[in-house]
Amino acid sequence: MGAGIFFSSLCALRDQLREHTILNDYIRYLMTLPCVLFLSSFGQAVIVVLCRVLYFDYSRFRYFLHKSFLSVLGRRVGLGGITVVIKAWQVITHFSVFSGAELYIGGHPCTSLTSVIVV
């Protein structure tokens, strides 16, 4: 419930600041970072633990993330020099699609999450 309100407020803020390019890029980065965490196995493990601690239904939370970020993940999201390209069929068939994502930095494939974060 709290996560839904948080991401809804981020979406509303992003819509209000759409004309400001720098702020819009910052909001888009904030919206994409949870996607990367969710797609990594470590991020999923953290989410499962948090859901168990907070007595929250993990399947509902996973469904919310899947639906909320599908539009973000389904297209190319530019973060400066980083472009994340997601294959649509892997997004639909798997919730853990980080292995199916192709991460490009300056046109070169990147397989390490840490090198993405460093850049």
UniProtKB/Swiss-Prot annotation:
Domain of life of the native organism: Eukaryota
GO cellular component terms, A-Z: membrane
Main location: membrane
Protein name in UniProt: Putative uncharacterized protein YGL072C
Membrane spanning residue stretches: 30-50
Miscellaneous comment in the UniProt entry for this protein: Partially overlaps HSF1.
Naturally occurring in which organism (per UniProt): Saccharomyces cerevisiae (strain ATCC 204508 / S288c) (Baker's yeast)
Localization annotation: Membrane
Keyword terms: Membrane, Transmembrane, Transmembrane helix
Protein's membrane topology: Single-pass membrane protein
